[in-house]
Design a protein with these regions (language model features):
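Transmembrane alpha-helices of multi-pass small-molecule transport proteins
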Residues: 36-87, 112-118, 167-175, 191-212, ...
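C-terminal transmembrane-helix exit sites in multi-pass transporters
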Residues: 57-58, 111-135, 271-291
Length: 319
C-alpha cells in the first residue's frame, strides 16, 4: 500500500523511481538513433524484445492461476489493448523520425488531456479543473506549433503522429486499468500477450508499408533483424532498460509512493528525455515557441492528473 507521507517512504524507493524515470526517458533518443531501421519495423523489434523478457513471468503466473482465470471477455480486451499499444508505439516511433525529440516526447505525453475528452463516454464527470487543465495544455500545444517551419526539424506531421500516440495509449491504459484493478489479472499475464500481439501487428504493418520480410538477409529490413549482432545490444537495452527496469520499476515503487506522485513524476519524461538527447548528440532543437508552450503542455497535464486524483478521493469518500 502506498504511504501518503513522504517521510514514511524509504529512500531506495525514491532512487528506484528516479532510475525508472531515467530509463523510460532514454528510449526516445535510442530509438531515434536507430534511424537506419524503418520506424514500424523498429517498433516491432522493441515489442518482440520486450515480449521475450516478459515470457518467463507469463509462464509462471499463467500456470499458477490456470487458464480458467482468464475469460473470453478478458482475451478480447487484451486483443483490443494490443491494437492500441501497436498504434501508440508505431505512431510515436514514426514521429521520432519526423519531428524533434522534444516535440515528440511532449505531444506523446499529453494523454491526460485526451482522457478528459473520453471521460463522459466512460461515465466519469468532467469538472472545472479538468477543463482548465485541458485549456492550458491546448494553449501550450498551439504555441509549440509556432516552431514548425518548412524544411525544419519540427513538423506538423511528426507532432500529429506523436499526438496519435497519446490518443491511442489512453485505450491501452484503460484496458490495463480494467484488467489489472478490476479483474486482478497478474502483471505478466496481462503484459506479455499484449506486448507480443502488438509486435505482430507492427510486423504486419512493416511488411505492408516498409517492405520488411522474415527471410531478408539485410537486418535493417528483416522482421527478426534485431537478432543481428549489430542491433541486438540496442534492443536488449530497450527491453531491459525502458521496458523492464522502467515499467517494472514504476509498478514496484507504487508499493511505497502514491500513484499521483508517480504519475506527475513521469510527466517530466519530455524534460529528462530532452536532456538525455542533448547529452547523447551534443545538440537540441528547442525553439522559442517550444520553450513557451512546452511548460504549459506539461502544466495542463499535471493539472488534469491532480484533478482526477481529487475526484478519486471524493468518490472513495462517498462510497
Amino acid at each position: 500500500m502506498s504511504e501518503s507521507s513522504s517521510s514514511a517512504t524509504p529512500l531506495f524507493a525514491w532512487a528506484l523511481l528516479g532510475v525508472a524515470l531515467l530509463a523510460v526517458s532514454s528510449a526516445g533518443v535510442v530509438l531515434q538513433a536507430m534511424s537506419e531501421v524503418p520506424p514500424l519495423l523498429r517498433a516491432s523489434w522493441r515489442m518482440q524484445g520486450t515480449a521475450l523478457i516478459l515470457l518467463p513471468g507469463f509462464v509462471y503466473q499463467f500456470r499458477a492461476m490456470g487458464s480458467d482465470g482468464v475469460s473470453m471477455r478478458d482475451w478480447q480486451i487484451i486483443l483490443a489493448s494490443s491494437v492500441f499499444l501497436a498504434i501508440h508505439f508505431g505512431a510515436w516511433v514514426w514521429s521520432l523520425d519526423h519531428t524533434s525529440l522534444v516535440h515528440s516526447l511532449l505531444f506523446v505525453s499529453i494523454h491526460p488531456l485526451v482522457l478528459v475528452l473520453l471521460m463522459p463516454a466512460i461515465g466519469l464527470a468532467v469538472r472545472r479543473g479538468h477543463i482548465t487543465g485541458v485549456m492550458v495544455g491546448i494553449t501550450g500545444a498551439l504555441l509549440s506549433l509556432g516552431d514548425v517551419e518548412a524544411g525544419g526539424e519540427v513538423t506538423v506531421s511528426g507532432d500529429a503522429a506523436a499526438f496519435l500516440g497519446a490518443v491511442t495509449v489512453v485505450g491501452y491504459l484503460l484496458a490495463g486499468r480494467h484488467l489489472r484493478s478490476e479483474r486482478r489479472m497478474p502483471i505478466f499475464v496481462y503484459a506479455f500477450p499484449v506486448t507480443f500481439a502488438a509486435g505482430i501487428w507492427l510486423a504486419l504493418a512493416a511488411i505492408s508499408q516498409e517492405g520488411a520480410s522474415m527471410t531478408d538477409v539485410v537486418p535493417e529490413i528483416s522482421l527478426i533483424g534485431w537478432t543481428d549482432a549489430l542491433w541486438l545490444p540496442w534492443i536488449a537495452y530497450l527491453s531491459l532498460g525502458p521496458g523492464l527496469c522502467g515499467h517494472t520499476g514504476i509498478n514496484t515503487v507504487l508499493r511505497w509512493i502514491t500513484p499521483i506522485t508517480v504519475s506527475i513524476t513521469l510527466l517530466f519524461e519530455p524534460v529528462v528525455g530532452g536532456i538525455i538527447g542533448w547529452l547523447w548528440t551534443g545538440e537540441a532543437t528547442l525553439g522559442i515557441w517550444t520553450v513557451l508552450g512546452g511548460p504549459l503542455m506539461l502544466t495542463g497535464a499535471i493539472m488534469v492528473t491532480l484533478e482526477e486524483e481529487r475526484g478519486d478521493r471524493d468518490r472513495d469518500a462517498v462510497s
